[in-house]
Each structure stands twice: as C-alpha cells, then as structure tokens.
Amino acid sequence: MRTMPHHVTQAAPAAPVPTVASPQTPHHHPWPGQAILNDPVTARVLHAAWSGDPAVIVPSPPGAGKTRLVALLAAALAGRADLRVGIAAQTRDQAVELARRVGALTDTAALIWSAKHPRPDTPGTRIAAGTGVRYPTDHGGILIATTARWLYCDPAQLRCDIMIVDESWQATYGDLGALGAYATQVVCVGDPGQIDPVVTGETRRWRTSPTGPHLPAPDALIAAHGDAIATVTLRHTWRLGPDTTALIQPAFYPTLPFTSRRPPEHLTDPTGHPLPEIAHQQVAVNAGPGDPALVTACADRVRTLLDTHLHTSEGTRALSDKDVAVVCAHVTQAAAVRATLAHHPHLLVGTANQLQGLERHAVVALHPLAGYRDTEGHATDPGRACVMLSRHRAHLSVVLDATTPTVLAAAEADDTAARTHRTVLTALLNTPRT
C-alpha cells in the first residue's frame, strides 16, 4: 500500500495522469444481402456457396421466397465475398423482377438486355446492351440475364465465379451444361413440383436415361453427380395457407414436406361472412375444353370475388382486379376469359406456364381436365395442376367439369398422373361449393 511522507504538509501538485488510447468501438455497417443470415436455412445456402461446393441445389415449395433468396445470395457473394456472380432466369419477366430485387440491395448489378426490346424499369440496376457488357475489374459484381441470353454471350468475356440458376427446374440439363462454360460453381434454386422444361426436339433416345439433356436440370444433375452436391431445402411457404398446403404437399411434393407460415389472410363476402381458402364449382360441359360454359363460370366467379373484401395484417380493403388472377390450361381458354372480362384491364389472365412464379390474393383456376373425356396428352401433367392450384394467397376457386371424376375413374391403374389427379380431385370435391 502506498502512503504519503509525514513531512508533507500540503498537497503537492498532481502529476499529469498519462492517457491511454482506448480502441474505438468498431462500427458494423450492414453489407448487401446481410438479411440472408436472419434465417438459418438461407444462411446455410450462403455457407454452402461461399464454401466452394461445386453445386448447391435448393428445392423449394411454392411461395417460399425463392426470388428473395436469389437476390440476397447474389448481393452477399458479390458485396461480401467480392465474387463475380451470374444469375440465369428462365424468362424475361423473371429476369426483370430479379434485377429490381437485386437493385434494391446493391448498385453493382446489371441486366443484360437486348436492344430490340423496350428497356424495363429496374431501379438500382443498370441496363447493359450490345457487346460491351463486362464485370467490374476492381470488385465483385452481378450480371443478370435469361438462360437463352447467357448462351448467346461469349464465356471468355463474361466468365464468373458462380452462376445462380433461378427457377432451375424449368431449365434443361443441356442448358445447365452450357452455362457451365461461364462458371465452375453453380447454385440451382427452384420448385420441383412445377412444370417441366418445354422441349420441342426429339428426346426418345434418352427416354430411359436419368441424365437426358431434356430433363429438369437439378434432377439430372443429382442423378449424375449426387455425391458431390449440397442440398439445402426450403421447408416453409409464405404464400399458401394451411388448407392449400394440406392439399398440394402430399400430392405434388411427397419427398418435400413443408408447412405454411403465411400470415392470416382471408376474404369476406358483402355480408361479412368469411370465404373458405379453397372452394369449387362444377359445370356441365358438352363442347370440350373450349365450352363457353367454362368461360362463363370463370367470369362469373371473378365478378363475385370483386365484391368481396380482403383482410390481412395490414387491414381491410375492397378486393380489386389487380388482386385477382384467372389461370387456365390453354391459351384459347385464357383468351376467351380475357375477352369476357375486358372491362377489368388489371385482371391477370393466362395459362399455367404464363403465371408460373406469380401470385395474387384471389385466383380462379379452370381445372386442366375440364372438357376432356380421356387422360391422354398434357392435360394430366401434374406440374401444370400444381401451378394452377398454388398461385393464390387468400382464396382459390376451382371450376370443375362434372364429368371429370368419371374420366379419371376410367384411367389405367398404373397411370401415376391420373392417380395424382384423382387424389387432388377428391380433396377439391370435399371443399365448399361456390
């Protein structure tokens, strides 16, 4: 213990106290795409990609946030890991939507776009056309284009560190192989229950091959290199309610269990009575898939829905034509419905292929087998039915042909597609009538 000397009668001037420079508290600035760490599942996707796994496959149910994941992953890899990232979308609309999402996170992205098409509005993402498209030379960057556009470019000039393939179950294995010229690492994100790639060429020679170039890219990739592939599964849907999840999960995703995390959302009729999440209407059809009775039923149901109110966590409001979609199996059906409801310009009407990846609060679906008297052809494609039954958030009305149960009952016992349709139709017939 230190004591003062006895002869000291007054305090001596205090010696200056040496100052020690204390380290400053570091400021942690958020980096582009950092929200990907907020969920342990999406964080695993980032970890797998950043770790250098040659292929990462992310199977997802409808409405699980695939587009958001792709945008966050690309922004994180470019902004935090300083990588050159390519994003391959399957349609121009998907590419534009991704450009908007990525542009909201980082200013290092560009959308490769043909000068022949009108320039889309993509805030935060520049439009790159012509032959002068390049990655930045001093930091990471992101280039977004359709798969077809990527295959038109020169891999020697646009080589990237990692290629993210959005809606990859819509891409063929042949397309994925061609994209391999751009990057040695690939991330495939998509929905395995939706429509397979549209292939117009002859594919009989690969009929029994699990790695045929016409097959969905992730399925063939797993068949060819399963041991080298990391798989991270998204197991929650934020779009579909519990009733819809219970309908489509066992029928279309038997190996991909998932649950609903959609916030409460429903419609009410003019009397305030809640509408069920799923309802159906049976129609007598005599003139095939183009029967006017089917078109009339769809149009009448849309008019009824436009008199309802939408209830969400944000409040209550009248349902508008911007909130409603009609999905059909055929272009001619969609055209007839669109013409009948032409006074509702914001109503979304299209085929399952056209509406794949889109959503609305309320949807009217024309059953793909309506008007058919056999189960041959593309009408029984499970992927098409899956898309048609999963575009809605609050309500789905399904217009059915009253003869369809008899048609499916007469199908061959080993017809797996017809068996899936029988299961789904039985569940639909147990929903309330409109």
Where are these regions (language model features)?
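Pre-P-loop entry segment of helicase/translocase ATPase cores
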Residues: 1-55, 117-134
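Short N-terminal secondary-structure initiator segments
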Residues: 9-24, 138-139, 211-226, 339
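A broad, low-specificity signal for short, low-complexity segments enriched in glycine/proline
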Residues: 19, 45-49, 105, 124-128, ...
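Short basic/glycine-enriched coil/helix segment immediately N-terminal to the Walker B
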Residues: 50, 54, 136-140, 150-162
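Inter-Walker segment of RecA-like/P-loop motor cores
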Residues: 104-152, 351
